[in-house]
């Protein structure tokens, strides 16, 4: 919900947080942070087939919810490792999209902020599906991406952005980890 009027800038009345009547704990209706990595190798993109609802059976980018105090870059690397067995180091942000987690509508408690990174697949390491996480993993060329996609509110836009990024250099904005670098990063050329 917006906090200010888009026309005049005046503050808008904000709804109070949802509060538990039993223990008085407040629950804010903020978006849940999620992170994923567009893992590529030789021009192909690694996708996973979801093993669980929502969107069970649909193709998705490896990713998931960020843990408490987990940097999105770390979450993206962890999710790729858990779902595919690959060790990657996300190197640049592709973009961010807001969406609903569940297919039954944009309920305020299901809103997600999805942060996607580029990552190169290491060497010739084979990706393998962890059956506790995903049903299948597969590599797809940019012009052969599957039609059955999870999260249709944002994933098609993510894949369009990935395809477009493959045609230009630099691909995206480099991401800074939690640590402040000892020196300024080299400018992107």
Model region roles, listed by residue range:
Residues 7, 19, 46-47, 60, ...:
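Conserved beta-strand segments that form the floor/walls of ligand-binding pockets within enzyme
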């Amino acid at each position: 919900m917006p906090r200010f009027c888009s026309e005049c800038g005046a503050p808008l009345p904000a709804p109070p947080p949802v509060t538990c009547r039993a223990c008085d704990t407040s629950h804010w209706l903020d978006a849940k942070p999620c992170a994923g990595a567009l893992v590529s190798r030789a021009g192909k993109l690694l996708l996973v087939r979801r093993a669980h609802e929502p969107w069970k059976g649909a193709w998705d980018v490896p990713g998931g919810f960020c843990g408490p105090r987990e940097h999105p870059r770390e979450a993206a690397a962890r999710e790729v490792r858990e779902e595919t067995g690959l060790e990657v180091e996300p190197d640049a942000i592709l973009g961010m999209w807001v969406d609903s987690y569940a297919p039954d509508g944009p309920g305020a408690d299901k809103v997600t902020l999805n942060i996607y990174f580029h990552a190169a697949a290491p060497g010739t390491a084979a990706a393998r599906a962890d059956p506790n996480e995903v049903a299948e993993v597969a590599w797809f060329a940019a012009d052969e991406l599957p039609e059955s996609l999870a999260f249709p509110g944002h994933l098609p836009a993510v894949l369009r952005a990935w395809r477009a990024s493959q045609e230009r250099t630099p691909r995206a904005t480099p991401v800074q980890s939690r640590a402040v670098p000892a020196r300024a990063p080299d400018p992107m050329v």
